[in-house]
Amino acid sequence: VADQPHSDRWIILIAYLTGLSIGVHLLNLLCLPAIVLVYYYKKTPNATAKGSLIALLGSMVLVAAVLYGIVPGIVKVGGWFELLFVNGLGMSFNSGVVVYIILLAAALIWGVYESYTEKNKARMAISFILTIALLGIPFYGHGASSIIIGILVIAALGLYLAPSVQAKIKERWRITARTMNTALLCTMMIVIGYSSYALIVIRSTANTPMDQNSPEDIFTLGEYLSREQYGTRPLFYGPAFSSKVALDVKDGYCIPRQSEAGSKFVRKEKTSPDEKDSYIELPGRVEYEYAQNMFFPRMYSSSHAPLYKQWVDIKGHDVPYDQCGEMVMVNIPNQWENIKFFFSYQLNFMYWRYFMWNFAGRQNDIQGSGEIEHGNWITGIPFIDNLLVGNQELLPQDLKNNKGHNVFYCLPLILGLIGLFWQAYHSQRGIQQFWVVFFLFLTKPLHNPVNEITRMLVRSTPLPSG
């Protein structure tokens, strides 16, 4: 199928399904690395490890283009048009968004037409760059920096796609009309799939009883899509649960240090029916800045401090803290304790345990908080279970006879590992299939970055309260 004429239509179908999946769950984007590997192995019979790594890097760029580019970019550029037409030209609400949608559709159609006919390489490049710009892909970040980054990216892309430059570079690095046409069609399908979010605006406009964030315009839709109601969590760098807010002395008073995350636009309430529609700018989300920070903070919530200590024997280390001119010592977890909690709770208890329930066995279906008698994974093999959770024969009858109790003696796990290694070392095609499945299911390392962007998914797994 991959070598047949018009086989690119399957790639375009995948792009459409990707656009639809954005409206379901952004973690669906993590299928793209596996799909790119399938494409690479189909197109390259003598695939190499180097080529596989390059394909994976390309897939990461693809994921980033959708996650950091198209998803927030459409809302961002649409917001610029909305401000121009409503605040600048005095038109009604959503008029700028309507114009933006029309221009985006026209640019996509023009780009597909130019890349299909190949009549003029300059027009083909211009239509492609215009489409990318209207999608907001180059405008990464917030505020003026996003505009500067966008201009630089557009300029670099324009220089690279210039017909004179394309004629001089090596053939393998040229962007062919077919590649550009396929890219534009895929982008069009992603946008069509992504447009399923229009239902959110339509539903909110009807003022239904459940109307969270009330996303009735492009700006409130942006807040809804970024899940601002769920707040933020430190991912790569931030405070620990015992960190103190940084203090500044101003006019003889201690003032907590705060940072403002941009600004937002909201509809202005009319004082009379004759007043024109307009948006007003309000301060964005205000967050406290902390004096003690660490890399990859897993134990960050001050309200869960006692529960953290149930999982890790926290000794910590003392860090000096300027409390308005008075130096005091603050004890925060060290990096090893932080990583230990990550492995013992977030990976082992909240990830590996669920996995082993299905491939080794389950003790019972009682919600556990780390106790040896509630909800652990077991094998059914006594000497292994004794090492993991103690002698199961000593449990009371109500736990032994729990309906959630299942033991598989690790047979599914053993059979899976046998199949995995057989597939990996059976042939070249087998090792290719192995890596495809590996990257399709091994998405845990990518969960945290994607979850932080969506702000709705599980970022730092919440601790049980019981």
Predicted features, each with a name:
Residues 176-201:
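Internal/C-terminal transmembrane anchor helices
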Residues 27-39, 72-75, 147-153:
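Transmembrane-embedded, aromatic-rich helix segments that form part
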Residues 126-134, 189-192, 408-415, 427-449:
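Transmembrane alpha-helix segments characteristic
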Residues 204-421:
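Lumenal/periplasmic acceptor-binding loop at the mouth of the active site in multi-pass
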Residues 1-10, 37-48, 109-119, 159-163:
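Membrane-interface transmembrane helices that cradle and orient dolichyl/undecaprenyl
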